[in-house]
């Protein structure tokens, strides 16, 4: 018997949803993927129009449900939700527990330390993840070395409100920047690797070293800014996006006086590449500042790019020069067996969620009450009005119960703090 689960990733340029079958062995098989634009409803990862976001959620899940019904499944009425927003970042925390006389840190002590981190209460913030970097003993105390993934409460609450409006149960809120780290190898996590998830409006900076996450920041800057710059040359936004993807080269190759065909404007390739590279150099400068802030300047052995923006031509060359990292590669999700088309970098966040999705998201059939069954057996019929009332009473949406709490400092005041 297979389990049907579902995931929705709320990105900066698109909302992506997947329906997934899980067999008895725990293997995931993607049944369908659907995407829609976030324009007008989500900005920098935060919901700005609850009604419109809910409508797009309903539309996506209806499409997924129609796909899986061909295999005998029911409707999808729940989903895991992946979120990322500009307020999301890591924060060090050091919980402590008094040890017994043997001064031994066992699993029970580790669990107590982790629970303390989850229960940390700070006004207006959520804790979305806890990463342990180890423990040490100070006198008679076991002290945890934790990285908390935190964000403003409005980030997750906006998603909960939209899901409630769409009448879809939230199984769990997942911080996708933390999950995307699974695309790295153990060796990369051990030896200082910069992971850049490059979206339209957001760029997530994660630094891994000594086997785990050491630093995470989400910048409110993305590759959409390049599209806007190109559009100022007299192009529509969608045409500017196509020009950026198909012709732009951030490495600024020598193109002479060559121009792009099939355009109503005369835009030399050399000028286009200056536009593309200038904006990406600005992004690279901000990334470099965050590396310095994390005290990893000159200490990174490699860089891995993912996300839709990572496919920009010439980007690896530009970042190699700007960040002084020689080993740079682009990668999609590879930690679960998927079709090659599902491994593309722009789907990495969605695909990275799936190994964490284990609960059924399939709507349960509505059972008839004993009284209703008896009435049918006696050959009597209820009025349409009564039937509608019974149906409304029978179908109840489960309550959304997500734990709240967490911390993140004022974004722009904290973003560049400590950088000379």
What positions do the PLM features span?
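Amphipathic coiled-coil signal-relay and dimerization helices
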Residues: 90-92, 206, 217
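A short acidic Gly-Thr/Ser loop motif
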Residues: 8-14, 84, 187-188, 195-202, ...
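Short acidic/histidine-centered micro-motifs embedded in hydrophobic/aromatic stretches
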Residues: 176, 246-247, 306
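Long, charge-dense
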Residues: 103-124, 231, 236-253
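Helical "lid/coupling" subdomains associated with nucleotide-phosphate turnover
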Residues: 44-52, 58, 172, 182-184, ...
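Nucleotide/phosphate-binding catalytic cleft detector across ATP-hydrolyzing
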Residues: 1-14, 18-193, 269-272, 294, ...
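Short amphipathic alpha-helical segments
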Residues: 19-21, 93-94, 207-209, 316-319
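A structural motif specific to WD40 beta-propellers
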Residues: 31, 214-216
